Amino acid sequence: MNMAETQLNPIARPTAPAGFDPAQSGQSQAPSRPKIEINDLNFFYGKYHALKNINLQIPEGKVTAFIGPSGCGKSTLLRTLNKMYALYPEQRAEGEILMDGENLLTTKRDISLLRARIGMVFQKPTPFPMSIYDNIAFGVKMFETLPRSEMDDRVEWALTKAALWNEVKDKLGQSGYGLSGGQQQRLCIARGIAIRPEVLLLDEPCSALDPISTGRIEELIAELKSDYTVVIVTHNMQQAARCSDYTAYMYLGELIEFGDTEKIFIKPVRKETEDYITGRFG
C-alpha cells in the first residue's frame, strides 16, 4: 500500500455533520469490501453510556486491532459484534452493525447461529472439561452431523490451522486442562475455527501468556487472516503494530482514530492518538 492510498479520509456516511473537518477526524474509510460496517453505534450498561456514536468499517480478510487505555470501550465494542451482551437485560446497543447487509443488532437470527458466524476467543484460555478431541468436536456437533471419519478430519484440520496438531495428535483423548497456557489458548482458537466462522474475535488473547506462547499466537493470527476476518483487542501496542493491518484507537467510549496500522503508528492524524502511541498518555 503506497502513501497515497494510506491518506486518512472520513468514514463514508450518507451526510456529513455540520462543521465536520476531514483533516481532524482521524477516521479513514476501510477498503471497498468491509466485512462489518458499524453505523452510529451506542452502547449502555444500564444508564452508563459506554460507547458513543461509533462509525467504523472492518475490512474483510484483514486483521483489525482495537487499542486504547483500560476502560476506553474496546472490549465492549468487540463484544457487541456477536451480541455477548444479550445475556444481560440491563445492557443494550443502539445503531447498526451490518454484516453482509444484515443488521446484527435487530436480526431475528438465532443467537447461536450468529456466534457460529462470528467466533470469539477470550483473554483467559477456557478449555472445556473434556478431552482435546471433544473440545473441538463439541461446537461442530451443534451445527453439523458428521460421520466419525469426517469429524476426525475436522478436528485434525482445526488443530492444524491453530498450529497445535503436531503437539497433541498422540494425546487427543487426554483432558485439555493438561495443556500449557499457550497450548490451551491455541486449543480455544482451534475450537473457534472448527465451526468455520467468517469472523474471529480475539479479546486480549495473549495477556496471560509467556513471550514464546505469545509469539506463536501472533504467527497464527497472521496465518488466519487468509481465511477469516480477524478483530483483536490488545493493550500491547507493539503487538497491534506487528499483527494488524488496521488499527482503531479508542478513548472514553469514543473512536478517536482509525486507519492503516502503519499510518496510525508512524504519522497519526489526532494528537490524542500520538500521545497514546508515544507513551505521553495512558
Curated annotation (Swiss-Prot):
The keyword ATP-binding applies. Keywords: ATP-binding, Cell inner membrane, Cell membrane, Membrane, Nucleotide-binding, Phosphate transport, Translocase, Transport. One of its GO terms (molecular function) is ATPase-coupled phosphate ion transmembrane transporter activity. Residues 1-33 are annotated as: Disordered. One of its GO terms (biological process) is phosphate ion transmembrane transport. ATP binds at residues 68-75. It is found in: Cell inner membrane. GO terms for cellular component: plasma membrane. Pfam families: ABC_tran. InterPro entries: AAA+_ATPase, ABC_transporter-like_ATP-bd, ABC_transporter-like_CS, P-loop_NTPase, PstB-like. It comes from the Bacteria. Its EC number is 7.3.2.1. Part of the ABC transporter complex PstSACB involved in phosphate import. Responsible for energy coupling to the transport system. The complex is composed of two ATP-binding proteins (PstB), two transmembrane proteins (PstC and PstA) and a solute-binding protein (PstS). This is Phosphate import ATP-binding protein PstB. The gene is pstB.
